Amino acid sequence: PAQTAELWDNGPRWWLLPLRDAAAVRGLRPDMGELRDWTNATEATGVAIYAPEHADGHDLVVRAFCPGDAVNVPEDPVTGSANALIASVLAQRHQLPGRDGHCIASQGREVGRDGRVHLYVDDAGVAWIGGQVQPVIDGTVHW
């Protein structure tokens, strides 16, 4: 059966689309014009598409497309808000892969990155995310 995208809001509004096959997620070549029109019409940040995959130390494959006016990034290599939302939804449905509320998402390989997002959903249902970062700017803001 076909999967259905659902619109969720965790601050940013994300369309989430689960697929059964990680290879299908990795092989996506979406029409960015159509995605831009859809996300603009629904005032969404973007579309996050994911599937389980237990390989190379991760449990999920995630891709996030944000070509609309809200972000204007065709594909985000690592997306904290989308990953946190996916983890929350999967935990609510008792479908979070991994163990004891923990899992690791792979994102960004298709755009030349190999991001790993560590996801944890605690007993209260709060999603926590973490991982390694590559700082691109450092400083202090005074106000």
Language-model regions, residue ranges each:
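Active-site proximal loop and beta-alpha junction motif in alpha/beta enzyme cores
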Residues: 1-143
